[in-house]
Amino acid sequence: MAAPLGGMFSGQQPGPPQPPPGLLGQASLLQATPGVPRTSNSTLVDELESSFEACFASLVSQDYVNGTDQEEIRTGVDQCIKKFLDIARQTECFFLQKRLQLSVQKPEQVIKEDVSELRNELQRKDALVQKHLTKLRHWQQVLEDINMQHKKPADIPQGSLAYLEQASANIPAPMKQT
């Protein structure tokens, strides 16, 4: 169905990769986790991949298409999904453990990553603020245009004496002589 994950990335050698330096002797994705039954050459990644494929296989299985009981189909799919979720949790736990080990061994690396994430978040939020300011300016201009349209008819007096009324309003009042 799908190609194995081992050959998906360029430059990756087939076969099990070596654990990172400093982590020798510790459980890795290539070694079985204590307390979890595994086949001799199986890894968490392999099991995650096979359980993912099993989820899809159970959904498109010819047995189910040929009219198997709906409850039986549901049970089979539920079992496949539960297995996939269980292995996904184990994989997540593995990476969380590695993250914890990294934070203990190289705390400055974790701080650098946090600072980088905060900078990226600030840039994203600044861009969002600029986007909203642009929209705000646009709508302010729209409102100003609407207000100007409403004021224009009121500024121009109507009727036969309108011109005289407007002209006389602009003439300054005579000054009183004392």
UniProtKB/Swiss-Prot annotation:
The keyword Protease does not apply. Its main location: nucleus. GO terms for molecular function: actin binding. Disulfide bonds: none annotated. Residues 109-145 form a coiled coil. InterPro entries: Mediator_Med28. It is found in: Nucleus; Cytoplasm; Membrane. GO terms for cellular component: cytoplasm; mediator complex; membrane. Keywords: Actin-binding, Activator, Coiled coil, Cytoplasm, Membrane, Nucleus, Transcription, Transcription regulation. The keyword RNA-binding does not apply. It comes from the Eukaryota. Residues 1-25 are annotated as: Disordered. Signal peptide: none annotated. Component of the Mediator complex, a coactivator involved in the regulated transcription of nearly all RNA polymerase II-dependent genes. Mediator functions as a bridge to convey information from gene-specific regulatory proteins to the basal RNA polymerase II transcription machinery. Mediator is recruited to promoters by direct interactions with regulatory proteins and serves as a scaffold for the assembly of a functional preinitiation complex with RNA polymerase II and the general transcription factors. Belongs to the Mediator complex subunit 28 family. Component of the Mediator complex, which is composed of MED1, MED4, MED6, MED7, MED8, MED9, MED10, MED11, MED12, MED13, MED13L, MED14, MED15, MED16, MED17, MED18, MED19, MED20, MED21, MED22, MED23, MED24, MED25, MED26, MED27, MED29, MED30, MED31, CCNC, CDK8 and CDC2L6/CDK11. The MED12, MED13, CCNC and CDK8 subunits form a distinct module termed the CDK8 module. Mediator containing the CDK8 module is less active than Mediator lacking this module in supporting transcriptional activation. This is Mediator of RNA polymerase II transcription subunit 28. It comes from Bos taurus. The lineage of its organism: Eukaryota, Metazoa, Chordata, Craniata, Vertebrata.
